[in-house]
Amino acid sequence: MVELTNEIIDYQTLTEQIRSDQAGAVVLFLGTVREMTKGRQTLALDYDAFPEMAVAKMEELEAEVRDRWPITNVGIVHRLGHLELGEISVAVAVSSPHRELAFEAGKYLIDTLKMTVPVWKKE
């Protein structure tokens, strides 16, 4: 499940969507707007994307993770628009039978998403 949204990310709903009776672990990563970036104070961030391209890349990433790890479910949600300090910009959730797999897949997801999905932020 992948989504780009201009709305506040509901990470509780995301977590419920990926939970499964076959999964003994659910890992959730939330990226938030932090106050300091490279020694400079951040007041807010604006996120923009080419939606079709970003969703396509997110779907490719979801498929890749499903191929590499025996996970149960995956959820990726990225927010667009103007975000204030503390607001959630991205949520990645993974469920799997065991926690080690969920952590590995979740870390790979967020690291690869940051490098490959065409979403830009402006301070």
Model feature map: region roles:
Residues 1-90, 95-123:
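N-terminal, polar/charged subdomain of small-to-medium soluble alpha/beta proteins
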